[in-house]
């Protein structure tokens, strides 16, 4: 054939063909229908040795182009854009083309998975294999490069089982959802040796090259981010656009955890210890496994009260929280609680750990009593940072209205002390609620408090109540203890009749 001889004369061996960015592409539109893909675009040539082919037309011509040579064969090419396809006829080589249609094509890629870290470049290489080989291999086939994104949704799930004793995790595949596929590029070669491609919709995101000598195609995915997680399809089609081979190469976007922290909130003596392990900003979800240790020994979470959940932050990655509950005897010292985190992707593994020791608080003893016109609060065995706040009818009182003193050290708990605080009672002839509250514990504000009512009513006092009445009226009734008194009153507005005292027993 004429074309192979011409290309061999130009230096077939060692040539690299580069699919450049859309700056070298004239513009195109591609059908997204993957079941029946139809090419409809104005193709652009792929450069040879970095220089564009000058004789390649701007767009496929609707006219037939004939090329005569000194040989007895005529090579005719017909390009039809109205049918959205290329038709290649070679009258002198019908037998050769007939043989080519029976060739067995295949695509061999150097990997099935590409693990690439965030903001870096992922690469893979695929080789076209045709048995038996011929110079027209590329002319008979089309290569489509299709990207199928996979995204993760933020969900919550309790731990169901341990993969290893004490090792828990959330399977990321449970939360993986495919998105709409996207045709990245469609590559074909005409009988003159020129490679054509559709423009990439992502600018310089994808870089594709072809080596005609080794029949290999390389793909680079630059500046990888979370949206690049998914798999590439390399689809080989025949010149009738029928799919022959479909290879999948998974693009695994990777990000090691940015930080690991253990939070162990304070507890009261005798209450269970609780801890949370927070693994921040990793990818993908499901790549992190958490195990727990208590004083260096394996601690196993309980499925009925412990678990893990995660969420995804756009631009930052996934965050996982794992929890554990441990017993508290109330006698032993608080344990060292450790979280061991293993991040795994393929053959890569990264481990880290964090530790926390919870603070244990002891129950204080409070008592409230009234004496000599004061509400007196006695407190035993509190840490030095604890103070007292008084409330009257649940309203906080200024600290200038009461005083608190240290009365000594606690005999049963080291570095704890005893307090006494008092506030004057209100002599307002009613019942008044007084509350002595301890402030400074890392629990609910009303966790430690005592409340009592001070009864200042006359009946509670058990003494006569003297009422002085000044008035200009007359009154006519007799008072007896225990009676209900309905007394008629005669009011005189001009003069004062008398002053008197009513004594009610």
Curated annotation (Swiss-Prot):
> Would you indicate the residue range of the signal peptide?
1-27
Ranges of Low complexity compositional bias?
61-71
Virion surface compartment residues: 28-464
Cytoplasmic face: residue ranges? 492-505
Say if the entry is tagged with keyword Protein transport: no
Q: Which residues are glycosylated?
A: 45, 90, 99, 119, 211, 353, 399, 428
Q: What Pfam families has UniProt attached to this entry? A: Marek_A (PF02124)
Instruction: Give the matching PROSITE patterns.
Output: IG_LIKE
Its membrane topology: Single-pass membrane protein
Gene Ontology CC: extracellular region; host cell plasma membrane; membrane
Instruction: List the keywords (alphabetical).
Output: Glycoprotein, Host cell membrane, Host membrane, Host-virus interaction, Immunoglobulin domain, Membrane, Secreted, Signal, Transmembrane, Transmembrane helix
For this protein, the parts annotated as crossing the membrane are 465-491
The Ig-like domain extends over: 257-355
Keyword Glycoprotein, does the record have it? Answer: yes
> Where does the source fall among the domains of life?
Viruses
What residue spans carry the region label Disordered? Answer: 51-85
> Where is it located?
Secreted; Host cell membrane
| Task of the protein | May play an immunoevasive role in the pathogenesis of Marek's disease. It is a candidate for causing the early-stage immunosuppression that occurs after MDHV infection.
Q: Which family does it belong to?
A: Belongs to the herpesviridae glycoprotein C family.
Record protein name field: Envelope glycoprotein C homolog
Q: Where does this protein come from, organism-wise?
A: Gallid herpesvirus 2 (strain GA)
Q: Upper taxonomic classification of the species?
A: Viruses, Duplodnaviria, Heunggongvirae, Peploviricota, Herviviricetes
